[in-house]
Amino acid sequence: MSILTTVLVTFFAGMGAGLGTGFAGMSAAAVISPMLITFLGVEPYMAVGIALSSDVLASAVSAYTYHKNKNLDIKNGLIMMASVLLFTVIGSYAASLVPSATMGGFSVFMTFLLGVKFILRPVMTTKETMAQVDAKKRAVQSLVCGAMIGMICGFIGAGGGMMMLLTLTSVMGYELKTAVGTSVFIMTFTALTGAVSHFAIGGLPDTLTWALCVVFTLLWARIAAVFANRAQPKTLNRATGVVLVVLGIAVMGFQLLA
């Protein structure tokens, strides 16, 4: 495999993953994994490990950008994160007991549908509306929704970022920027946990592919997060929707190729 091919594939994979992360808190695994498997012949387990490790820094830099612009709910984010991590383990164990069925297509299709939703029905909640919710109620919501997301993610092994964004905006009534900021904050830690366990079990991947994916994803996530925090709500909804629809269609295409 030529170095040029590796650079091109990782650049576009990182671009898709970074834009998805910075705009919508989407997991890099949804974009990077299928591209590495389809075009570079990377073994699936390794591809997911590379994608998760690319997610860590991209989510961290996005979370920092959202936090700097006061678009991050750390307190409830921590409650939800603990709940998500615990129930992901329970969900993974439950999945190991039933006949294996790959559900990767589910999260990609969900990405596409969520994109359509943001374009047609933008999230126009304001911070003032969010502030009216009782703190205790918000904490309970974070706990329950985190458990639900973790259980689904652990069971089907995908879809965390999109599940979180959908839950935060539709169920918990978060304003879009705060929802994405909180989602990428949680994902920094869930991706780190996933990446470490992947590499502990499967060993380290090809250094060049790995490094390029991490750098390109980080770069594009930073660009997307800066733009997202400056944009007006309606513009942001449309931009997020377009990014998700395009990524959803592209990844469905890669899955057909594979």
Q: Predicted segment positions?
A:
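Short, structured loop/turn "capping" segments at alpha-beta junctions
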Residues: 126-127, 143, 158-163, 174-178
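Transmembrane helix-bundle signature of multi-pass membrane transporters/permeases
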Residues: 18, 48-56, 180-191, 244
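Membrane-interface alpha-helices at helix entry/exit sites of multi-pass transporters
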Residues: 42-50, 75-76, 173-184
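Juxtamembrane transmembrane-helix boundary motif
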Residues: 1-19, 33-39, 44, 65-151, ...
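Transmembrane helix boundary and interhelical junction motifs in multipass membrane proteins
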Residues: 23-32, 157-167
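A small-residue-rich subset of transmembrane alpha-helices
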Residues: 54, 182-199, 208-221
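Hydrophobic, membrane-facing alpha-helical anchors
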Residues: 1-6, 10, 53-64, 159-168, ...
